[in-house]
Amino acid sequence: MDSITTAASVVAAGLAVGLGAIGPGIGQGSAAQGAVEGIARQPEAEGKIRGTLLLSFAFMESLTIYGLVVALVLLFANPFAG
């Protein structure tokens, strides 16, 4: 593999994981904030709010996992390497 392609792949893999985690991280923080506020306002709805929160966390975390998969493909099965 060419050294420039290798270096670009490593940088791209790092960016894929790093940038792929920023959005879900911010989203999880704001979702948790909303859930805590909702539970504080209506303690009797805690179970329903918690279930919805955990489901939304799973969907948000899948975006981070997609970034990780892209990074692993770039590092170990690089389609750009000749």
UniProtKB/Swiss-Prot annotation:
A GO term from the CC aspect: proton-transporting two-sector ATPase complex, proton-transporting domain
Q: Does the keyword Membrane apply?
A: yes
Cross-referenced NCBIfam families: ATP_synt_c (TIGR01260), PRK07354.1 (NF005608)
Where is this protein found? Cellular thylakoid membrane
Q: Which stretches are transmembrane? A: 7-27, 57-77
Q: Does the keyword Metal-binding apply?
A: no
Judging by the UniProt lineage, the source's domain of life is Bacteria
Annotated membrane topology is: Multi-pass membrane protein
What name appears for this protein in its UniProt entry?
ATP synthase subunit c
Q: Note the PROSITE patterns from the entry.
A: ATPASE_C (PS00605)
Give start-end of the signal peptide: none
Q: How does it assemble?
A: F-type ATPases have 2 components, F(1) - the catalytic core - and F(0) - the membrane proton channel. F(1) has five subunits: alpha(3), beta(3), gamma(1), delta(1), epsilon(1). F(0) has four main subunits: a(1), b(1), b'(1) and c(10-14). The alpha and beta chains form an alternating ring which encloses part of the gamma chain. F(1) is attached to F(0) by a central stalk formed by the gamma and epsilon chains, while a peripheral stalk is formed by the delta, b and b' chains.
Protein task:
F(1)F(0) ATP synthase produces ATP from ADP in the presence of a proton or sodium gradient. F-type ATPases consist of two structural domains, F(1) containing the extramembraneous catalytic core and F(0) containing the membrane proton channel, linked together by a central stalk and a peripheral stalk. During catalysis, ATP synthesis in the catalytic domain of F(1) is coupled via a rotary mechanism of the central stalk subunits to proton translocation. Key component of the F(0) channel; it plays a direct role in translocation across the membrane. A homomeric c-ring of between 10-14 subunits forms the central stalk rotor element with the F(1) delta and epsilon subunits.
